[in-house]
């Protein structure tokens, strides 16, 4: 696998998380350690074990919000303890301001700004740490573009 940044996009339920676990197993078979940032809070530990993931070489972190996820990815990369870091998923990296806000408040562009911050803080570390960053993302339909 090339050592850099990979994004896998697809529809919900399309097998992206399962594919990432298969990649994790292959990384571990080559002696690697895997960090899994579970932004969706949906990782099936049973599925991971059934697929052959070694829990001794597999660290799972479930962030509270998008900023927490970025901090954890950055920490994992700086530690140089991981050969593969998986982010599941970019779409689930909810900005802290959106979580903390009243339901009526509109927060246009927060996710885009968070992703820009993610790129600035994390992408340069990938090359320095000699690690694969595998990000999963969901394809969404923009209903406002029709009609």
Predicted features and spans:
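Glycine-rich P-loop/Walker A and Walker A-like loops and their local beta1-loop-alpha1 context
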Residues: 1-31
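Short hinge/gating elements
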Residues: 4-10, 102-109, 145
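Structural motif
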Residues: 7, 84-88, 134-135
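Fold-independent oxyanion-binding glycine-rich loops
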Residues: 10-11, 39-40, 89-90, 137-139
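A broad, structure-centric signal for solvent-exposed, well-ordered loop/edge residues
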Residues: 15, 68, 143-146
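Conserved inter-motif catalytic segment of the P-loop NTP-binding fold
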Residues: 22, 30-121
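Phosphate-binding/switch region of NTP-binding enzymes
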Residues: 76, 108-147
